[in-house]
């Protein structure tokens, strides 16, 4: 009975319209009968605990029970967060002002909290043509604004940002020229998911690169960007997926730049930075780190205490049709 309630709650939360839209997309991609797919989607909810979005992302239309059991589900992910991350430490990652203080040396760029007063902001502004302002608590690329000084008075900008509650001002990250080839209008970040084992060892479970769409200054998936899984040595080996267009790209749609074979600069250093960061807050053992790559190496953008489980399990990134649940289990136990 509980699973029936969960099923209808999840369908209703995304709307029946979206449910059938996804059903149609899976039908078009797989060529399978709509009724068969509908029944299997409902069955998968009860048997494996996945919603219709994950059904499409994981490619469940193409695989059977043994491989379906290798996937991390939403419930698995929530259970892992509850097990590995202590709620009273969430603020470290929910509030960027707290995060920035904790990991200041890994940010590797100056920033200022406007709530500390105008004088600090005025000093930060000296000689700057632009910078980024952020809400301390915001998600998905929202609450972020690129500020162009353009001769304006520092006091005017300060009051404007205070009014908009964009309390954090930080130096604009200038990404590595190679990373700029992916998309020049946004800083294209690497998402590195770390798990600290029961023995205190940091492990990288997966790494993704997120690429801007070309018309916004952020690379977030919710803002129209795309993503793809990286190989162990930091290469793009599979097409990038865009949720907004429900399309896989081997070339960037705005520039035509070929994605397959691209090597992330300073990838080893980025992994080392994330492992270092993973050990800094012992009560938060499961974190997704957003890393930017500059000419001088990797810098931290932010950390997330609810890392995604779905993106790294996109079926187009795994030729063997398997999920990464075993990778998480290994990381926890070793």
Positions of PLM-derived features:
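ATP-dependent carboxylate/phosphate-activation module, predominantly the ATP-grasp catalytic core
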Residues: 183, 187-270
């Amino acid at each position: 009975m509980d699973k029936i309630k969960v099923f209808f709650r999840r369908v209703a939360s995304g709307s029946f319209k979206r449910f059938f839209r996804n059903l149609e997309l899976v039908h078009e991609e797989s060529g399978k009968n709509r009724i068969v797919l509908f029944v299997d989607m409902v069955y998968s909810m009860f048997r494996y605990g996945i919603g219709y979005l994950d059904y499409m992302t994981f490619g469940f239309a193409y695989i059977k029970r043994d491989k379906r059991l290798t996937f991390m589900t939403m419930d698995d992910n929530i259970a892992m967060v509850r097990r590995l991350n202590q709620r009273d430490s969430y603020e470290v990652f929910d509030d960027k002002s707290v995060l920035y203080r904790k990991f200041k040396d890994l940010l590797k760029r100056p920033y200022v909290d406007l709530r500390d007063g105008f004088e600090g902001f005025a000093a930060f502004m000296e000689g700057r043509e632009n910078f980024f302002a952020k809400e301390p608590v915001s998600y998905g690329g929202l609450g972020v604004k690129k500020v162009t000084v353009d001769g304006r008075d520092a006091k005017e900008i300060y009051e404007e940002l205070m009014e908009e509650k964009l309390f954090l001002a930080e130096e604009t990250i200038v990404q590595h020229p190679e990373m700029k080839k992916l998309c020049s209008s946004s800083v294209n970040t690497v998402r590195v998911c770390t798990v600290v084992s029961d023995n205190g060892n940091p492990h990288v479970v997966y790494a993704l690169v997120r690429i801007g769409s070309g018309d916004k200054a952020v690379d977030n998936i919710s803002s129209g960007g795309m993503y793809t899984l990286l190989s162990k040595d930091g290469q793009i080996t599979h097409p990038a997926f865009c949720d907004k267009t429900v399309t896989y790209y081997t070339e960037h749609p705005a520039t035509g730049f070929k994605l397959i074979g691209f090597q992330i600069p300073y990838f080893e250093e980025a992994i080392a930075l994330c492992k270092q960061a993973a050990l800094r807050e012992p009560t938060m053992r499961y974190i997704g780190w957003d890393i930017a790559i500059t000419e001088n190496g990797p810098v931290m953008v932010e950390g997330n205490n609810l890392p995604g489980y779905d993106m790294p399990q996109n079926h187009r990134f795994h030729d063997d049709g398997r999920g990464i649940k075993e990778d998480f289990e290994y990381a926890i136990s070793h």
